[in-house]
């Protein structure tokens, strides 16, 4: 009898649930409101784009509670300035139809924090692992809401990208731009000023624009033309009307309130849209989406109980300080993501799609917080390490080693070569641990499966785009959880000492050790001099394996538990025959046989610096193959002057080339360019939030002025480029490093012979047009 009742109860529960199998392709926030929960006073209705096992898409919904103050702490915002009521009001305003949908200046970080934190809480609550992974979802038949997800075994689904092209340009009145810019006391990028000006108008502007979506199955094209009045829409031949469909879901969000209707545009043949800067107009996209949003939801929503979704854009353009990465994030409507590729190159597109899939769309939107948000625990509940690292390290280390490890609070950096030193005809090698600090983190927290996946990819040398988010993950850890950060740093320092000891036992002298890697040379024990170069890699690989084994043995001894396929992986980055060390952060390695080199610490910007770096490297090679006679020194001196004259000639030939002298900048104040650009400013507004290059110029009265040249298209007329002042610090470094090398080999070096007075050539560059 008891079994019958249990079976009936299970059957009744199943009947109340709709079960679907497939994968989640995308999630976003549909609406947010306050609730009566004291600790998590916000409820978010989230939209899920779901693809079933037959490849058909559906709109699904779920709710999750969150706290504005917890969100603020995670994102480094002031929790005392953020209330749940304020956030609910902000999101409600974003659901009003007929308004320009870009994020206001003071809400950029709030929207970014709110979206990413909500989606992290949603994934944690429902229990799905990642986008495109096989899952069973359970939908409450009474409420229409997804209540749980259950991961199932099987291959990860492949994204179905569509290609997005948008075209259109809004001309904003110069006076409007200037008045908007005046509100930014610290300045702002032109892209931000323009979007802010459009936001002030509140209405959707009318202008000629075009949107095209192309998939393997169909092509959707709409052109909107401002031809007199009213505003007209044109369809084109060979055009699909079925690329997405309107779906009406009835949801019960509160049993004390009537059901609501959630309308959504559900795609039929794509689950993400890929675009490139060359084929993308942000203003055209936002205007198009705003018009669709207005048309779909502009009916009498109260009588029809339609819940209007948020429509809000955040990107580098909405950040008043700009950003150094490009992305486009539309929150809420229409219900699919935009993936931006840097170029139309297939590799770049693949990397962009991979980044979307591997991070659930959080990279680069969430920046360093990406893999913190993808952890299997709630963002505000980071667990404690499984081991007491401080105690265990003190037990498994001598007092001297423990003290040495504790001295380096951001990672151990040592260099045994106290003075600039040239090493010639030796068995030199460079080693690095791959994803070192992220791997150590996994040793403390092996259940972080999303970090596990990407670290495993990096250990296999896959997906080079992962290098930055993994690196930034470790960098942010200090702010989010300093105790865990210091534990990892301390473990890393102890491992570096273990590796050095192992290397020394094999007669390899680490010249420089920097946090997660080293370079050095094999020594001849009997003569205490570097061993000559070796013909094969056998001894280097023996060394690599021994050092890696000692690192992993130490990790195991102190209790680190790495997940499957993860171990500390020491790479042999290169074998060399010559080296020049100036300090721990500046060195040159060269292989005489294959001419492979690694030059660290010399400036790379502007492009002139890369020519100087190449010239210096050429001289270093010349020095290494020369003997230490006075005749050889004279030959090097002559060659040095040839290199200098060649650099001077290259600089002169490029004296008017903006791209040759421009450098990336972190300055984002473009207010002074509004009058200069006038109505033409719109041509570059859409990239000024993230793509920024400046060049130093000299005006007619001798003043140095920095010009953000990336704002202008094609050839631009500038004052004389300040070539000499660009060259001065680069050539000073060139001479200083070169003299150090020469002094390591010859005793009678005349510094003046290798120092260049570039100032005496200023007359060549005064009028460089």
UniProtKB/Swiss-Prot annotation:
GO terms for biological process: DNA replication; viral genome replication. Keywords: DNA replication, Host nucleus. It is found in: Host nucleus. It holds the Pfam family Herpes_HEPA. InterPro entries: HSV_HEPA. GO terms for cellular component: host cell nucleus. Component of the helicase/primase complex. Unwinds the DNA at the replication forks and generates single-stranded DNA for both leading and lagging strand synthesis. The primase synthesizes short RNA primers on the lagging strand that the polymerase presumably elongates using dNTPs. The primase-associated factor has no known catalytic activity in the complex and may serve to facilitate the formation of the replisome by directly interacting with the origin-binding protein and the polymerase. Belongs to the herpesviridae HEPA family. Associates with the primase and the helicase to form the helicase-primase complex. Interacts with the origin-binding protein. Interacts with the polymerase catalytic subunit. This is DNA helicase/primase complex-associated protein. It comes from Gallid herpesvirus 2 (strain Chicken/Md5/ATCC VR-987) (GaHV-2). The lineage of its organism: Viruses, Duplodnaviria, Heunggongvirae, Peploviricota, Herviviricetes.
């Amino acid at each position: 009898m008891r079994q019958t009742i249990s079976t009936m109860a299970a059957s009744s529960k199943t009947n109340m649930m709709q079960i679907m199998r497939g994968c989640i392709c995308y999630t976003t926030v549909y609406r947010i409101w306050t609730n009566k929960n004291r600790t998590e006073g916000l409820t978010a209705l989230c939209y899920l784009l779901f693809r079933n096992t037959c490849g058909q898409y559906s709109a699904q919904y779920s709710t999750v509670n969150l706290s504005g103050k917890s969100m603020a702490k995670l994102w480094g915002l002031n929790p005392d300035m953020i209330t749940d009521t304020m956030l609910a009001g902000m999101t409600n305003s974003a659901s009003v139809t007929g308004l320009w949908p870009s994020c206001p200046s003071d809400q950029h970080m709030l929207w970014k924090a709110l979206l990413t934190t909500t989606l992290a809480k949603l994934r944690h609550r429902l229990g799905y692992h990642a986008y495109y992974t096989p899952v069973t979802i359970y939908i409450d038949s009474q409420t229409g809401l997804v209540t749980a997800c259950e991961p199932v075994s099987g291959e990860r689904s492949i994204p179905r990208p569509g290609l997005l092209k948008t075209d259109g340009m809004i001309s904003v009145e110069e006076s409007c731009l200037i008045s908007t810019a005046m509100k930014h006391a610290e300045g702002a990028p032109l892209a931000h000023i323009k979007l802010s000006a459009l936001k002030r108008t509140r209405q959707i502007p009318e202008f000629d624009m075009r949107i095209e979506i192309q998939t393997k199955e169909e092509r959707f094209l709409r052109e909107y033309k401002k031809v007199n009045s009213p505003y007209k829409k044109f369809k084109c031949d060979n055009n699909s009307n079925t690329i997405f469909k309107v779906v009406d879901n009835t949801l019960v969000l509160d049993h004390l309130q009537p059901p609501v209707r959630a309308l959504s545009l559900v795609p039929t043949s794509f689950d993400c849209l890929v675009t490139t800067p060359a084929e993308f107009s942000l203003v055209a996209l936002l205007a198009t989406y705003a018009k669709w949003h207005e048309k779909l939801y502009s009916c009498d929503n109260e009588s029809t109980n339609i819940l209007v979704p948020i429509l809000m854009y955040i990107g580098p353009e909405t950040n008043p300080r700009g950003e150094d990465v490009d992305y486009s994030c539309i929150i809420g409507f229409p219900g699919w993501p935009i993936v931006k590729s840097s170029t139309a190159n297939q590799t770049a597109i693949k990397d962009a799609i991979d980044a979307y899939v591997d991070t659930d769309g959080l990279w680069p939107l969430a920046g360093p917080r990406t893999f913190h948000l993808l952890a299997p625990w709630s963002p505000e509940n980071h667990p404690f390490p499984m081991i007491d690292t401080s105690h265990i390290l003190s037990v498994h280390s001598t007092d001297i080693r423990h003290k040495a490890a504790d001295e380096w609070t951001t990672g151990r950096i040592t260099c045994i070569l106290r003075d600039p030193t040239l090493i010639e005809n030796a068995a030199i090698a460079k080693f690095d641990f791959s994803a070192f600090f992220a791997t150590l983190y996994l040793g403390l927290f092996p259940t972080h499966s999303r970090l596990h996946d990407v670290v495993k990819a990096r250990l296999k040398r896959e997906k080079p785009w992962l290098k930055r988010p993994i690196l930034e993950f470790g960098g942010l850890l200090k702010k989010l959880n300093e105790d865990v950060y210091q534990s990892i740093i301390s473990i890393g320092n102890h491992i570096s000492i273990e590796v050095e000891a192992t290397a020394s036992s094999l007669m390899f002298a680490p010249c420089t050790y920097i946090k997660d890697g080293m370079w050095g040379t094999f020594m001849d024990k009997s003569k205490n001099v570097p061993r000559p170069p070796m013909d094969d890699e056998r001894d280097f690989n023996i060394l690599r394996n021994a050092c890696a084994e000692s690192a992993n043995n130490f990790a195991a001894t102190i209790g680190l538990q790495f997940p499957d396929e993860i171990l500390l992986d020491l790479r042999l980055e290169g074998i060399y025959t010559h080296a020049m060390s100036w300090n721990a952060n500046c060195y040159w390695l060269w292989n005489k046989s294959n001419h492979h080199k690694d030059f660290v610490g010399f400036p790379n910007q502007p492009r002139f610096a890369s020519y100087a770096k190449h010239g210096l490297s050429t001289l270093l090679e010349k020095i290494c193959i020369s003997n230490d006679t006075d005749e050889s020194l004279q030959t090097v001196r002559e060659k040095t002057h040839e290199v200098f004259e060649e650099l001077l000639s290259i600089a002169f030939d490029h004296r008017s080339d903006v791209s040759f002298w421009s450098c990336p900048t972190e300055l984002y104040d473009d207010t002074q360019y509004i009058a200069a650009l006038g109505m033409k400013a719109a041509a570059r507004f859409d990239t000024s939030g993230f793509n920024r290059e400046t060049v130093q110029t000299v005006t007619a009265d001798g003043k140095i002025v920095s010009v953000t040249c990336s704002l202008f298209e094609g050839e631009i007329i500038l004052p004389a480029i300040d070539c000499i002042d660009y060259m001065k610090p680069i050539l000073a470094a060139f001479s200083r490093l070169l003299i150090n090398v020469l002094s390591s080999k010859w005793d009678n070096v005349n510094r003046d012979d290798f120092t260049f007075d570039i100032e005496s050539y200023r007359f060549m560059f005064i009028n460089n047009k």
